[in-house]
Amino acid sequence: MKDKIPVIGTGTLTDESVLPSMGDEALGVISPLHYSAALDNPQNKEFVKKYRAKYGKIPSYYSETCYTAMRLVHQAVTSLKGDVSKADRILSALQSVTLKETPRGPIKFDSYGNPIQNIYIRKVERVGGELQNTVIYTFPEVSQFWKYKPEEYLKRPLYTRG
């Protein structure tokens, strides 16, 4: 059936942690996410190389997310010279962090505390004998509001099923 209708799913559907067990059934599946172990940037190549050397497998979305989150925390704490005694200062420091070079690409935060980062459209392919999420399109610097102005978006009614 997937040769007639493309299979599209959430980013974690084909996460690198499950791809090996999915086999060829995963080929061609399309998914969006802010990370792929196949991203072609120097930071990701180094991250994948070191991760594979240490753990014997490629990193997943979960691994990269934890790694990048700790880099964000480290930069925020460093900017506070280690003084983490006041929650409001920690939050402010975190919201002001910008990382231009991470395995996933650049990341920063909007004034609401949500990330602004690239979203990658990925397609599962077999490359070098392994399944991977090949990036086929990049939406740069996506915020929670997509391409809408936050002020206008927030005026809209909340979604309900009723």
What spans do the regions from the language model cover?
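Extracytosolic ligand-binding ectodomains
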Residues: 1-162
